[in-house]
A protein has these predicted regions:
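N-terminal, helix-rich and Lys/Arg-enriched segments in bacterial and organellar proteins
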Residues: 2-6, 98, 103-105, 172-176, ...
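Bacterial Sec-dependent N-terminal signal peptides
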Residues: 1-34
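Extracytoplasmic electrostatic interaction patches
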Residues: 113-187
Length: 187
């Protein structure tokens, strides 16, 4: 009698083990299993930063009309524009880091102008910016040598672009020999 009870207990334990082998999950996709188990959404979210790490670019330009420009642009590691897309049930979040520019202008070896080129500078000096201007990032800035020599001023071209689109804002930062400046938005 004792061996019969032991046999039935062993049989019940064996049936339980064979029924808990995960076959019901093997027939479902990975995504269905994640949803059923209510696992964190971090498995279905991909976050990337562009650029991934700090980036810096320094450019010194000397012109024959006595102007010299020191331009430094670098990644803003705090402020960024987020573009969210959904692809194959995965949420893709791309963080485009904003860039900051610093420009120092010399005329005949004397410093005449220095400023930080960021969103606040354009917001202060340009009236007709798009409503979503905070979604634009500084793409590049460079000395326009031809116009600078022609007008005897330092003219810096600035390109701002909205990530993942063709929307751009082209501006010119015009600096005279006394350090007075003006920003013109090109149409």
């Amino acid at each position: 009698m004792k061996s019969t009870i032991t046999f039935f207990i062993a049989l019940i334990v064996a049936i339980c083990f064979f029924n808990c082998d995960g076959r019901h999950r093997a027939q479902k996709s990975y995504t269905e299993n994640l949803i059923k188990e209510n696992l964190p959404s971090s498995f279905s979210e991909q976050v990337t930063f562009y650029p991934e790490n700090y980036a810096e670019h320094v450019n010194d330009t000397t012109l024959t009309n006595g102007y010299r420009a020191h331009i430094k642009s670098y990644s803003d590691m705090v402020n960024h524009v987020v573009i969210t897309e959904k692809k194959n049930k995965t949420i893709l979040k791309t963080h485009y880091r904003k860039a900051i520019g610093e420009i120092t202008v010399y005329k005949d070896n004397s410093e005449v102008f220095m400023t930080v080129i960021n969103d606040q500078l354009f917001s202060k000096h340009i009236d007709n910016l798009p409503k979503d201007f905070n979604q634009y990032i500084l793409k590049s800035l460079w000395v326009n040598q031809y116009k600078s020599l022609k007008n005897n001023q330092l003219i810096v071209d600035v390109l701002l672009q909205k990530p993942k689109s063709k929307h751009q804002i082209n501006c010119q930062l015009i600096i005279d020999s006394k350090g007075k400046f003006n920003i013109i938005k090109n149409v």
